[in-house]
Amino acid sequence: MATQTIYDVIVVGSGASGGVAAYTLATKGLKVLCLEAGRMIEPHKDFHNHKPPYRWPYRGHGKPGQYGKLPQGMEWKINEWTDQLFTIPHDDPYALAPGAKFTWTRLRAVGGRTLVWGRESGRFGPLDFKPKSMQDGFGEDWPITYEDLEPYYDKTEALIGMSGGGEAVYNSPASKNALPAFNARCGELLIKKGAAKLGLKTVSMPLAVLSKP
């Protein structure tokens, strides 16, 4: 006789939020089921960043009309390089209330959009939480402060690994668990040299990429 497994928590989606939530709950001893609509990505098959346009049937743009009318801001994301990753709105429309307008770039895969972001991971600073009272008087202040979130920044960065960002700069707090930054590239060195002549300080961008094991 088949038995049914009972879970304490069901997490829908394995992206940045769902993945961390599932991991945190499971390590606390809860029985967690993580549901994911997508498949496991195989980097050597699914990423074609270095494939030149002339090797695609339609120079990377896709067959005319293939993707339907893409929402503004999404037209540069979905093409022959990426259509095996992203959900095509024309084929699988976003579920909305009648009359509502909303778009979101979706990627159905284990790990979600953590697979396709640039990994720049600077912290919000104190001013970002208080635009009205501490900046220009516009907008509304958040009901929380940077100090409220700081312990969670520390925990998250220690978990996922953060390179660079170990030095604070105006309204950009330092990462306390930062790994060494990657070596600067040629263009970055030129910018750093020019900034130094102007008396401007440059720091490495915090990246969620491991610079050492």
Language-model features and meaning:
Residues G122, E157-P213:
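Active-site/ligand-binding neighborhood in enzyme catalytic cores
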